[in-house]
């Protein structure tokens, strides 16, 4: 296990990048037109957690939000009822806990580590969660700032200013169930390895910082190169975590886009490669082109 922080970003924060032909394509924002569309739609790659000062919308993205008919995220983030209903699906099936999956020594190590980090959720709750979801709560502590933000939340707040409907490409329940396809034991072992390396002063925080820099720079090629170093035991589940969902989304978008202009804001990990949303949309007959997405960040990169 060499790159668990990268794995977490690619699976939970979805930060895989798109392979690019030249540096002019350094952007997170893409225009979708052609194939009979009466008006264009737009695709934007998000990150689910970053420093608040970096959660800045470009003028281009603000204009798009103002002019599209609806905004689609991976899930409907404006549906509080659904969000409350999905809490139970974050837990492992069969009343499984981390204590069932780990040796006594490893369990105590994980418990002490979480409690020492002062997680927002009590360990008694986190130990019932699917280990990769529990592990994702550790990432926020690795960010080089005190105040964090979600790009999706920033986009949604802007959309609400213009009373744009908020939709989801899939249900929260389905999204939470995806991790059931990865053996809980494997997830738990990865969590232990991550904590072992972090306690030894490993370079996970450095890698996380480099990934966030690449995201701020919109250097999707760099992100992809870093994430290709992910642990192969988790990479074996890329179809379930990313590609199957990409295919489902594109099929849905093929029906939605002819009738209305959309902004589709999903984790940047869903954009890349042969099975990424950009290429799948192109295969479906749409023209997908980069859009300049220049932001004025509060602090230097």
Task: Locate the predicted segments by residue.
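Conserved phosphate-coordination/catalytic loops
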Residues: 23, 52-55, 240-247
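Structured, acidic catalytic/metal-binding patches in enzyme active sites
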Residues: 28-237
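Bacterial Sec-dependent N-terminal signal peptides
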Residues: 1-25, 30
């Amino acid at each position: 296990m060499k790159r668990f922080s990268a794995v977490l970003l690619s699976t939970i924060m979805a930060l895989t990048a798109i392979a690019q032909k030249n540096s002019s394509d350094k952007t997170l924002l893409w225009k979708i037109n052609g194939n009979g569309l009466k008006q264009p739609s737009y695709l934007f790659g998000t990150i689910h957690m970053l420093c608040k000062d970096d959660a800045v919308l470009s003028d281009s993205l603000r204009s798009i939000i103002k002019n599209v008919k609806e905004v689609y995220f991976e899930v409907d983030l404006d549906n509080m009822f659904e969000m409350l209903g999905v809490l139970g699906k974050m837990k492992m099936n069969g009343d499984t806990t981390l204590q069932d999956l780990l040796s006594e020594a490893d369990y105590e190590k994980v418990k002490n580590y979480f409690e020492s980090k002062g997680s927002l959720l009590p360990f008694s709750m986190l130990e019932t969660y699917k280990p990769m979801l529990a592990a994702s709560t550790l990432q926020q502590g690795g960010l080089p700032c005190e105040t964090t933000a979600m790009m999706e939340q920033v986009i949604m707040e802007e959309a609400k200013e213009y009373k744009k409907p908020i939709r989801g490409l899939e249900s929260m329940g389905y999204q939470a169930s995806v991790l059931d396809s990865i053996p809980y034991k494997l997830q738990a072992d990865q969590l232990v390895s991550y904590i072992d390396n972090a306690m030894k002063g490993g370079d996970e925080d450095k890698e996380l910082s480099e990934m966030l820099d690449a995201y701020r720079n919109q250097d999707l090629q760099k992100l992809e190169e870093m994430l290709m170093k992910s642990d192969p035991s988790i990479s074996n589940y890329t179809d379930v975590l990313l590609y199957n969902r990409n295919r489902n989304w594109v099929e849905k978008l093929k029906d939605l886009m002819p009738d209305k202009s959309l902004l589709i804001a999903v984790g940047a990990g869903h954009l890349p490669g042969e099975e990424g949303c950009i290429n799948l949309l192109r295969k479906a007959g749409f023209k997908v082109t980069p859009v300049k997405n220049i932001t004025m960040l509060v602090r230097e990169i």
